[in-house]
Amino acid sequence: MIYLDNAATSFPKPARVVDAMTEFAREIGANPGRSGHRLSVEAGRTIYDAREALASLFKIRDPLRVIFTANATVGLNQALLGLLSAGDRVVTSGMEHNS
């Protein structure tokens, strides 16, 4: 197979990613912050651990400033909405992300 849409879906996923997601789904499977039960708290801890690891990697002082979005389009749009004001103009080319 020749897969030409890697930027959209990151296929194939690295085995470690598949293993971690499978383990989370089998062992925890709860929504973080949705409740106070053990699995919900554990889900929240897992996400916070990921925030800490990314904060360390990118030299971000406060791990709570690391956010997760559904995909690159959502992340880029959120960043732009935080930077732009009404009346601002954005110039792009055909080479930019299509969000």
Each predicted region: which residue ranges?
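Pyridoxal 5′-phosphate
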Residues: M1-S99
